[in-house]
Amino acid sequence: MIYLKNKEDVIRMEGTIVEALPNAMFRVQLDNGFKVLAHVSGKMRKNFIRLVPGDRVVVELTIYDLTRGRIVYRKKLDSKGEEEILDDDE
């Protein structure tokens, strides 16, 4: 799923963390099959959001460099280990 932000030249995409790297960097495989190098956003760092390989995340990519991104959200899993589906209406 691709989201476009209006205020910046940013593309949001969903993916899965494949590998944890030093300095809070992660290799993320996007839903379209591409792998990108992503770092954790400042708010996630500040709130001590832990990321491990296998987590579903939302990554922001700039239109200028599609090989690097910023992880802005970790998807929540329900009790069965499946991704919760959130309605846009709520």
Swiss-Prot record:
Pfam families: eIF-1a. The keyword Protein biosynthesis applies. It is found in: Cytoplasm. One of its GO terms (cellular component) is cytosol. GO terms for molecular function: ribosome binding; rRNA binding; translation initiation factor activity. Residues 7-76 form the S1-like domain. Keywords: Cytoplasm, Initiation factor, Protein biosynthesis, RNA-binding, rRNA-binding. SMART domains: S1 (SM00316). It comes from the Bacteria. Its main location: cytoplasm. Belongs to the IF-1 family. Component of the 30S ribosomal translation pre-initiation complex which assembles on the 30S ribosome in the order IF-2 and IF-3, IF-1 and N-formylmethionyl-tRNA(fMet); mRNA recruitment can occur at any time during PIC assembly. One of the essential components for the initiation of protein synthesis. Stabilizes the binding of IF-2 and IF-3 on the 30S subunit to which N-formylmethionyl-tRNA(fMet) subsequently binds. Helps modulate mRNA selection, yielding the 30S pre-initiation complex (PIC). Upon addition of the 50S ribosomal subunit IF-1, IF-2 and IF-3 are released leaving the mature 70S translation initiation complex. This is Translation initiation factor IF-1. It comes from Fervidobacterium nodosum (strain ATCC 35602 / DSM 5306 / Rt17-B1).
